[in-house]
Amino acid sequence: MSQRTRLSVNVNKIAVLRNSRGHGAPDVIRAASACIDAGAHGITVHPRPDARHIRHDDVIRLSALTRARGVEFNIEGNPFAEPRAGYCGLLALCRETRPHQVTLVPDGDQQITSDHGFDFAREGPGLRPLIDEIKQWGCRVSLFVDVNVTGLADAAIWGVDRIELYTGPYAEMHHAGCSDAVLREFATTARLAQDVGLGVNAGHDLSQTNLGVFLGAVPDVLEVSIGHALISEALYEGLIPTVRRYLDILDSVNPAVSMR
């Protein structure tokens, strides 16, 4: 079975706008539903301990929406962040909702956004039991990684299904007009992951401007998760037209790729 690279829309920024006024508008569920109407293959959220955007009830409602609409639900987050008032912890959320995919990300509480991947040598011992637990719930496990990450074979042994390439460095180089070298590094990392049986996702600062070039250079990317750029572009172009433009890019730049 094969599929083209899939688009999962991160709706965190919708929640940021809603929370800025403390009311229910804009409606995160309505926005996610519009993305699905436009053809998005999935919805991504990254709940944080400070509830700065996505909240517990959003996760519950989005889980129900994605299952009803037959698209994937991807929950991202730091599995080591301690539960606290208003935040039950990433694993508790995933245990409750059983998303299709859980993407583990090593972000700190004070980070504005994710900016690095896991160090497998240092953090692997702590990750392994969490991976086992998540997979017992029937969820696919993806780890957020930097380009040129080492230890991919170890991750495969732990039961990891996919990696998500942190594409921030590529986006910076593309903006500067000098992305060829870093693209080669991303392509090499993707191939190394695929050689040990890992699927490859990608995300962070991907946009209509740079997505096509990335997918044209990096082989067999199964999924891209895009939020900030897509929501920013949607302010000018509309949400449904923007999602469709991303889908057009996916259709134009890569053929069907093997599912993992």
Swiss-Prot record:
GO terms for molecular function: pyridoxine 5'-phosphate synthase activity. It is an enzyme of class 2 (transferase). It catalyses: 3-amino-2-oxopropyl phosphate + 1-deoxy-D-xylulose 5-phosphate = pyridoxine 5'-phosphate + phosphate + 2 H2O + H(+). PANTHER family: PYRIDOXINE 5'-PHOSPHATE SYNTHASE (PTHR30456:SF0). Homooctamer; tetramer of dimers. NCBIfam families: pdxJ (TIGR00559), PRK05265.1-4 (NF003626). Belongs to the PNP synthase family. This is Pyridoxine 5'-phosphate synthase. It comes from Xylella fastidiosa (strain Temecula1 / ATCC 700964). The gene is pdxJ.
